[in-house]
Amino acid sequence: MKTMKFDQVQMEKCKTFKSIGDKYSAGQVTIIGGSKLFHGAPILALKSASRLVSMTYFSSPEGDKQIVENIKAGLSSFVWIDRAEVDNYVRKSDAVLIGPGLMRSHIKEQNFVCDEHGAETRKLSLDLFTKFPEKKWVVDGGTLQVVAVSDIPKGAVVTPNKKEFEMVFGEKLKDDLNARSEQVFNLAKKHGLIILTKDTVSIASDGKEIWLVEGGNEGLVKGGVGDVIAGLSVGLAASNDLLFSVCAASYLVKKAAEKLAEERGFMFNADDLVDVVPEIYGGLKL
């Protein structure tokens, strides 16, 4: 099975910031996430996405105003929207990320039986998927852990870690790279999704093509890295197709990790990645 390598040559195809005109010409995205337990995840996603688009809208769980205050303390480049208004903003957004920091408690993982908090996340996610099946979706975090693969809109991006991969697809990621590439390709084709794995060699496939993203280092095992990738993916998706966006997001994060490792070894975290990714992007002279 033929695989292709995503590198700087591919990055040069990026359409972000190529057609700048009015205030909204770089695109608009909505991010839905956050909870009393997980308010760091959406901050990382918001920071990553907001540097790539004209407008970033954020919706958090209804009634959890403290979540918004905590997030605003670390970031001001977004517009908070009330849960009752989320449909309107999803409708006008070019791409939507759902899941970072949403509650995902399970009673029974493989059959998606959830407690009250997980059930709320599931209800919200399914409602939006039903209303906006044609939207560019990036599905991650809490949502990815409480919905069945058949619930996810066709053409959507999923960015599972190894545990989430097994939960969603019912099988473990294979160890061998060639076997894993074929596995991801077949699952993407079967379910009509775009899958991005987060490995030493990350794999992205839409069931038609297989792209390999090499690089990075052991510093990427830190918590929050997936939220950075998800945020970059939705930001890039405002101006690019989804398969390119996830490949580019993975590439930028891996290159940022390499740059940080040169300066401080593996003593960096997801916050550091968010700050260094723009330097990597700028250095590409796109």
Name the predicted role of every residue range.
Residues 1-23:
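Positively charged, low-complexity intrinsically disordered leader regions
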Residues 2-7, 57-215, 282-286:
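Glycine-rich phosphate/dinucleotide-binding loop and adjoining beta-alpha-beta core of small-molecule
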Residues 18-82:
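Substrate-binding N-lobe of the ribokinase-like
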Residues 31-34, 100-107, 237:
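Glycine-rich phosphate/diphosphate-binding loops and the adjacent beta-loop-alpha structural elements
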Residues 167, 222-252:
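Short, small-residue alpha-helix embedded
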Residues 180-189, 242-257, 270-278:
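Short, well-structured alpha-helical segments that form the helix of a local strand-helix-strand
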Residues 212-224:
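Short pre-catalytic strand/loop immediately N-terminal to key active-site residues, enriched for Gly-Thr
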